[in-house]
Amino acid sequence: MKLKKLFLLILIVISSVISSNVNTNEGRLNTDIKIVSYNIHSGVDKDMFPTLFDIIDFLKNCDADIICLQEVNESAKVGFQVSSLKEELGMNSHFGANVVNLNSNYGLVTYSKYRIIRQNHVYLSSSKEQRGILHTVIDVKGKNVNIINVHLGTNKEEQEEQLKELQTFIEGLGNEPYIIAGDFNAADINLDDNCIDVAKTLDKSNTLTFSLGIERIDYIFVSQDIVPINYRVIIKKLSDHYPIIAKLRI
């Protein structure tokens, strides 16, 4: 009888452990995150009026898990924007300067509520102003998720080469999930079939993201194992671009 009770107790413990592992895995598979991508134009609007504090307020109110910013200027002249945003948002961050001058560093920054476990900055082939991608790996409840913050050039030939380099970089990630967000400076961007265009998938690709144009030039792409839930373009005239926001299921 004692052996039978002991056997039953062992079965209960094993069942409990298995159930716990299943629930943990389900939690990892069903984590919803909010991401914002925004070219902040060095903290000025299209008329060059300073808007950095309004941008900070907007981003704080978004309550996003991940924020990818382009055209961020870390200099005494316009304010140390990377540092100011980090302090106000209270998030982990990684900055990559595409352009380094004597008095300023200008480029990409990614903020994350999740722990950053790896990061690197890659220069893209550029014939005019230097462009690049900022790669950050975050830990989302035990799962590595690659965040790729992008700013491409404005010249068509330059863009084609930069897209090839971006594609090669993505292929190097293997099977890890990824999110690509940023300013591509071109309409009708298509990556390979493994990349999901979030706006197009949710039938919202006709919304412009650039206040001086009539087309969508800012994008969020995800790998096949990430599910787009919703997508919005926010008409905020704090930059020459509009911010884009997506909810994704990891």
Where are these regions (language model features)?
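Structured beta-strand-rich core segments of catalytic domains in phosphoester-bond hydrolases
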Residues: G27, D47, Q70-N144, R232-I235
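Active-site beta-strand/loop signature of hydrolases that rely on acidic residues for catalysis
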Residues: K34-I40, I55-V78, T136, N146-V150, ...
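Short, solvent-exposed loop/turn segments at secondary-structure boundaries
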Residues: K46-P50, E158-E161, V233-I234
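Surface-exposed cleft-lining segments at the edges of enzyme active sites
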Residues: S42-V44, N120-L124, V150-E158
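Internal catalytic-core helix/loop-beta-alpha segment
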Residues: Q130, V137-V140, I148-K156, E160
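Residue-level detector of structured alpha->beta connecting loops
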Residues: D63, G90, K113-R115, G174, ...
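N-terminal, active-site-proximal structural segment of metallo-dependent hydrolase catalytic domains
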Residues: K2-E87, N101-S104, L108, K164, ...
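Metal-dependent phosphoester-hydrolase catalytic domains
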Residues: S19-N23, H121-V122, V137, K156, ...
